[in-house]
Curated annotation (Swiss-Prot):
Domain bHLH: 6-61
Domain of life: Eukaryota
Location of this chain's protein in the cell: Nucleus; Cytoplasm
Protein name in the entry: Transcription factor PRE3
PANTHER family: TRANSCRIPTION FACTOR PRE (PTHR46446), TRANSCRIPTION FACTOR PRE3 (PTHR46446:SF3)
Complexes and interactors: Homodimer. Interacts with BHLH 147, BHLH148, BHLH149, BHLH150 and IBH1. Interacts with SIEL.
Gene for this chain: PRE3
GO MF annotation, one: protein dimerization activity
Lineage: Eukaryota, Viridiplantae, Streptophyta, Embryophyta, Tracheophyta
Role this protein plays: Atypical and probable non DNA-binding bHLH transcription factor required for MONOPTEROS-dependent root initiation in embryo. Promotes the correct definition of the hypophysis cell division plane. Transcriptionally controlled by MONOPTEROS. Moves from its site of synthesis in pro-embryos cells into the hypophysis. Regulates brassinosteroid (BR) signaling by sequestering negative BR signaling components. May function as positive regulator of gibberellin signaling. May play a role in the regulation of light signaling and possibly auxin signaling.
GO CC annotation: cytoplasm; nucleus
Species assigned in the record: Arabidopsis thaliana
Length: 93
């Protein structure tokens, strides 16, 4: 009983999200992940796996952005064309 009271006190000042809303968000995340998007609807994937795969996917995207930024910087540093100057100015804005 005290556990229920403490939970209700903790959430009284914040908006609550229903279990159905959480499940809908998990399904939406699953549809965004390439590895899980292709799994059949009948295949039940746990929410924990969806969240873990989402975190891994975001980390990989960050790494790709960092790598591409580095490659672009190297290409622009080695190029003295007007187009490269324009791209450099756009990137520093």
């Amino acid at each position: 009983m005290s556990g229920r009271r403490s939970r209700s006190r903790q959430s009284s000042g914040t908006s609550r999200i229903s279990e159905d809303q959480i499940n809908d968000l998990i399904i939406k995340l699953q549809q965004l992940l390439p590895e899980l998007r292709d799994s059949r609807r009948s295949d039940k994937v746990s929410a924990a796996r969806v969240l873990q795969d989402t975190c891994n996917y975001i980390r990989n995207l960050h790494r790709e952005v960092d790598d591409l930024s580095e490659r672009l910087s190297e290409l622009l540093a080695n190029s003295d064309t007007a187009q490269a100057a324009l791209i450099r100015s756009l990137l520093t804005q």
